[in-house]
């Protein structure tokens, strides 16, 4: 499996008095733990998006962001030579579901199982409103015995020699994600002729959204670099790692000056060199996120 990178961001979090009181009550009750913190973080992230003025129509999933970074603006398709994006998008789905409180890893137990040997468990089967995510969630929920993160990335990509497991493959993922972006007004749909066949393409129609995405990635490793993945927004951290795993992160760095480019790639390397097994033990982490990182960087 290909190597994968980082995701970082210094997202300013605003807490209201009510949310602080709720958090205090949760701690006083002794419940919630890391999972409660993840759900609270997800709610705060959504509030931050609202504060920034992003409408629901332009709020993108991790999969859509990675695909958008990989799409050629005018041509409307990803590079024919990119054989990494398929597995990268499946990793995005697992992290997206985890950040939304749908998936978690089984307990590590007394023997301290590694991230790559721990199984993925369905925490909640509540619909997400995204067809691809719900399809992946259904597979995880109904599969017994459970599978590991690495196995799920392979199964959802169709990379298995077991014919009995081919039904796990999510088909036409890039095309379905592109159609989502068309509905959100980011892309459009065209037909292009390639010698012997016609191909549906999705050229960029709203450059502002893509430029905001590129700027967000650049700032995460330049102006807003915090030198600590646990101080970064989890969603942005995951975006950096999975954009690298999907071989599309370079597209975000292409406009940078040489000095900025060198600094950005150096900081990405710092993230890639982190040990997921160590990072997942720290406070307020998402274990599925680090398990996906481990699967791509092992």
Curated annotation (Swiss-Prot):
GO cellular component, one term: cytosol
Region named Disordered: 1-57
Membrane topology summary: Peripheral membrane protein
UniProt-annotated stretches for the region Beta-hairpin required for oligomerization: 190-201
Subunit description: Homodimer. Interacts with the coatomer complex. Interacts with MYO18A; the interaction is direct and may link Golgi membranes to the actin cytoskeleton. Interacts with GCNT1; may control its retention in the Golgi. Interacts with VPS35.
UniProt keyword Ligase, yes or no: no
One of the GO biological process terms: regulation of mitochondrion organization
Alphabetical keyword list: Cell membrane, Disulfide bond, Endosome, Golgi apparatus, Lipid-binding, Membrane, Mitochondrion, Phosphoprotein, Protein transport, Transport
Protein name: Golgi phosphoprotein 3
Amino acid composition bias (Basic and acidic residues), ranges on this chain: 14-28
Xref: PANTHER family: GOLGI PHOSPHOPROTEIN 3 (PTHR12704:SF3), TRANS-GOLGI PROTEIN GMX33 (PTHR12704)
Subcellular location: Golgi apparatus, Golgi stack membrane; Golgi apparatus, trans-Golgi network membrane; Mitochondrion intermembrane space; Cell membrane
A Pfam family hit: GPP34
Positions annotated to bind a 1,2-diacyl-sn-glycero-3-phospho-(1D-myo-inositol 4-phosphate): 81, 90, 171, 174
Record-annotated disulphide pairs: 84-108
Compositional bias (Polar residues): 1-11
Higher taxonomy: Eukaryota, Metazoa, Chordata, Craniata, Vertebrata
UniProt-recorded Gene Ontology molecular function terms: cargo adaptor activity; enzyme binding; phosphatidylinositol-4-phosphate binding
Keyword Cell membrane applies: yes
Organism from which the protein derives: Rattus norvegicus
Record function comment: Phosphatidylinositol-4-phosphate-binding protein that links Golgi membranes to the cytoskeleton and may participate in the tensile force required for vesicle budding from the Golgi. Thereby, may play a role in Golgi membrane trafficking and could indirectly give its flattened shape to the Golgi apparatus. May also bind to the coatomer to regulate Golgi membrane trafficking. May play a role in anterograde transport from the Golgi to the plasma membrane and regulate secretion.
Family to which this protein belongs: Belongs to the GOLPH3/VPS74 family.
Modifications made to the protein after synthesis: Phosphorylated.
């Amino acid at each position: 499996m290909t190597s994968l990178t980082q995701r970082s961001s210094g997202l300013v979090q605003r807490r209201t008095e009510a949310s602080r009181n709720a958090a205090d009550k949760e701690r006083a009750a002794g419940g919630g733990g890391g999972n409660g913190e993840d759900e609270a973080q997800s709610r705060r992230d959504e509030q931050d998006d609202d504060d920034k003025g992003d409408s629901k129509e332009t709020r993108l999933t991790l999969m859509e962001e990675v695909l958008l970074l990989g799409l050629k603006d005018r041509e409307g398709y990803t590079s024919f030579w990119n054989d990494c994006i398929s597995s990268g998008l499946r990793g995005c789905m697992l992290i997206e579901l985890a950040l939304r409180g749908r998936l978690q890893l089984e307990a590590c137990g007394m023997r301290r199982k590694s991230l790559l040997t721990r199984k993925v468990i369905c925490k909640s089967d509540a619909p997400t409103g995204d067809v691809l995510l719900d399809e992946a969630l259904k597979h995880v929920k109904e599969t017994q015995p459970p599978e590991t993160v690495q196995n799920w990335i392979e199964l959802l990509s169709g990379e298995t020699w077991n014919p009995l497991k081919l039904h796990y493959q999510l088909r036409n993922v890039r095309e379905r994600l592109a159609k989502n972006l068309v509905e959100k007004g980011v892309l459009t749909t065209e037909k292009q002729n390639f010698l012997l066949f016609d191909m549906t393409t999705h050229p960029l129609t709203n450059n502002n959204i893509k430029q905001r995405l590129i700027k967000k990635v650049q700032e995460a490793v330049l102006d807003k670099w915090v030198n600590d993945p646990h101080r970064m927004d989890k969603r942005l951290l995951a975006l950096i790692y999975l954009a690298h795993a999907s071989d599309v992160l370079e597209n975000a760095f292409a406009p940078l000056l040489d000095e900025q480019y060198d600094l950005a790639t150096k900081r990405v390397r710092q993230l890639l060199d982190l040990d997921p097994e160590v990072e997942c033990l720290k406070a307020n982490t998402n274990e599925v996120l680090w398990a996906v990182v481990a699967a791509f960087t092992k």
